[in-house]
Curated annotation (Swiss-Prot):
This is Dual specificity protein phosphatase 3. Residues 28-179 form the Tyrosine-protein phosphatase domain. GO terms for molecular function: cytoskeletal protein binding; MAP kinase phosphatase activity; phosphatase activity; protein kinase binding; protein serine/threonine phosphatase activity; protein tyrosine kinase binding; protein tyrosine phosphatase activity; protein tyrosine/serine/threonine phosphatase activity. PROSITE patterns: TYR_PHOSPHATASE_1, TYR_PHOSPHATASE_2, TYR_PHOSPHATASE_DUAL. It comes from Homo sapiens (Human). The gene is DUSP3.
């Protein structure tokens, strides 16, 4: 591929780390990374009173499953709370194709934000790799941000570290959206 839009995983890693190449782990269980969109971990996702206090109307679990790498919630878990749920059975591995879920996740986030007081929590086990990747893809696809801008906005509001496979998928999305003229100039 050629073109000025092409970015590397290293370019994105440089935005995520400090000058010495160190990464920070999340200091809070949950952060509002852009208006009405929160990224968080399993503990906040499983704390329905806390979600209600935050005004969360929708929960997107980017790590649905029963293993130690996943968060074992489902629509039934939230049914009496009035919270709308979507689960994605994603693994936090470089080989996992999270981009296959970008559109579905973006539709769900849009559904939440279309409600007058809608707020969405996008979470995974730690709120560090899978869930921020989905929010970054959303900002690119629906708010026409390039990958560096979207990643920077999320990183300014939460310590994140998507794995290199997810960063590569975001670079591919950036190249595709740029070629289609779907990013802000």
């Amino acid at each position: 591929m050629s073109g000025s839009f092409e970015l590397s995983v290293q370019d994105l890693n440089d935005l995520l780390s400090d000058g010495s190449g160190c990464y920070s782990l999340p200091s809070q269980p949950c952060n509002e990374v852009t208006p009405r969109i929160y990224v968080g971990n399993a503990s906040v996702a499983q704390d329905i009173p806390k979600l209600q206090k935050l005004g969360i109307t929708h929960v997107l679990n980017a790590a649905e499953g029963r293993s130690f790498m996943h968060v074992n919630t489902n629509a039934n878990f939230y049914k009496d709370s009035g919270i709308t749920y979507l689960g994605i059975k994603a693994n936090d591995t470089q080989e996992f194709n999270l981009s296959a879920y970008f559109e579905r996740a973006a539709d769900f986030i849009d559904q939440a934000l279309a409600q007058k007081n809608g707020r969405v929590l996008v979470h995974c086990r730690e709120g560090y790799s899978r869930s921020p990747t989905l929010v970054i893809a959303y900002l690119m696809m629906r708010q026409k941000m390039d990958v560096k801008s979207a990643l920077s906005i999320v990183r300014q509001n939460r310590e994140i570290g998507p794995n290199d496979g997810f960063l590569a998928q975001l670079c591919q999305l950036n190249d595709r959206l740029a070629k289609e003229g779907k990013l802000k100039p």
